[in-house]
Regions:
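Active-site-adjacent betaalpha module
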Residues: 1-53, 60-63, 89, 96-97, ...
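Short catalytic/ligand-binding loop motif for oxyanion handling, primarily in non-cytosolic enzymes
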Residues: 110-114
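A short alpha/beta connector and helix-capping loop motif
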Residues: 50, 67-94, 98-106
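Short, solvent-exposed loop/turn segments at secondary-structure junctions
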Residues: 61, 108-109
Length: 311
């Protein structure tokens, strides 16, 4: 029998590697009545559910609703597949193990909008383009991109943070006010469909699910929910003593990835649910992120592995 190895020098913040079982214990010496062990793409890991949270990122109408994100092709989109994996397996598994569910969403205030840096304003569309969606002088003032990585965004949707989307046709003669882009309490910034129902059902005191750990909806004003110091998410995690984070949502390489890497730098344990995340970015973006998470920032697992985690 080989001796366990401590990873880290801080007496309150360390892991333990158990070579005989190839398991990394992330519990930091805390006692748990029901620690769980789950498989990842590398080691098996052991976590304390009481110190863990499933962070579901940006599953909002703006990013998912077919009224503003029409499907291309016949099959389900990557985001739809991730949504089903979470709804059918990932979220129920987290609840069954007693893991807190955090809904991390864009939800801007007027102050956020007035202090938003230009880089983020550009991301969501703020300057004029030609009707074709291409810059009039493209090729004259920019370098070539090979392969072509220039993304043509829908100008009806990407019209600028805080800009009113106007009426949104939901089908069957049903129309809703889309509201201002990603502003708090607007339709477009609300949780999408089944995720909204899932959140509200958990918050309902009559629901017989995880009453001791109600879901929490936390707003963010950047791609990362943990940027800077003292974010709403960071304050909540510190108050609850949460040290292990399982990540899901959209987009893998943008808001999910930004929050994950900030969490890694702040010392949280980072676990990516690869089938519970998605992105529309081509060029193998998801695989690159999974590779980096597995080899550098933490661990990669699946919703099924979470469901089948042993106690």
């Amino acid at each position: 029998m080989r001796s366990p190895q401590t990873i880290g020098h801080d007496a309150t913040n360390f892991w333990v590697y158990e070579p005989d079982s190839d398991t990394i214990d992330l519990c930091r010496g805390t006692k748990s009545n029901d620690p769980i062990s789950l498989k990842t793409t590398r080691n098996q890991i052991r976590i304390n559910p009481q110190k863990s949270a499933l962070v579901v990122i940006d599953m909002q109408n703006f990013f998912l609703h077919p009224a503003v994100r029409p499907r291309v092709g016949n099959g389900p989109t990557a985001a739809e597949e991730a949504a089903q994996a979470l709804l059918n397996t990932g979220i129920p598994a987290a609840r069954a193990h007693g893991i807190r569910v955090i809904w991390l969403c864009w939800g801007l205030t007027e102050h956020d909008l007035n202090t938003m840096p230009p880089g983020l304003m550009r991301t969501f569309g703020t300057y004029d383009t030609s009707p074709s969606g291409a810059k009039q002088n493209e090729g004259e003032t920019s370098l070539p991109s090979a392969p072509n990585m220039i993304r043509k965004k829908n100008p009806a949707l990407y019209k600028g943070l805080g800009t009113d989307l106007g009426d949104v046709e939901l089908g069957d003669d049903n129309t809703v006010q889309g509201g201002r882009v990603l502003m708090r309490d607007s339709w477009n910034a609300a949780l999408y469909d089944q995720f909204d129902k899932e959140y509200k059902a958990n918050r309902d005191s009559r629901a017989d699910i995880t009453r001791k750990k109600p879901d929490v909806l936390i707003h963010k004003d950047r791609m990362s929910g943990l940027w800077g110091s003292g974010s709403e998410l960071e304050i909540f995690l510190e108050q609850e003593g949460i040290t292990t984070l399982l990540f899901a949502g959209v987009n893998t390489d943008q808001c999910v990835g930004s929050t994950l890497t900030d969490a890694y730098s702040k010392g949280y344990d980072c676990i990516l649910l690869r089938d519970g995340t998605a992105t529309g970015t081509p060029f193998g973006a998801s695989e690159v992120w999974e590779c980096n998470v597995s080899n550098c920032w933490g661990f990669v697992t699946t919703c099924d592995a979470l469901e089948n985690a042993s106690t």
